[in-house]
């Protein structure tokens, strides 16, 4: 379950930022995670519940935004193509698509108090 390691890293970053800014608690953590990352949301939330105990994030709210997988075609200039079947070929011309969204894994913001 790599979600435990991911959440451990997120909480370490959040704790470091809280320390740097003199915050006594972390009220909220908002994440943006792309579909292409293969992160299981329920497992990440479970890891958050388990790992936040005894940290500044113990009472924090976790918000996770899932970024849909999208691509563009370099040949026919089609942009914002949804990739529901995970095929990386353009349905119109057969060119290999370029992923433009869905790879994200970032802390969008921390609410520190």
Task: Give residue ranges: language-model regions.
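Solvent-exposed beta-strand sheet faces enriched in polar/charged residues
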Residues: 30-32, 63-65, 108
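Cys/His-enriched microdomains
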Residues: 71, 88, 105
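Cys/His-rich microdomains that often coordinate metals
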Residues: 79-80, 96-97
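Long, charged N-terminal interaction/targeting segments
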Residues: 1-60
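Short cysteine-rich clusters marking metal-coordination/redox-active sites
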Residues: 73-76, 90-93
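Immediate flanking context of iron-sulfur cluster ligation sites
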Residues: 62-71, 82-84
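Short Cys/His-rich "knuckle" micro-motifs
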Residues: 83-86, 100-103
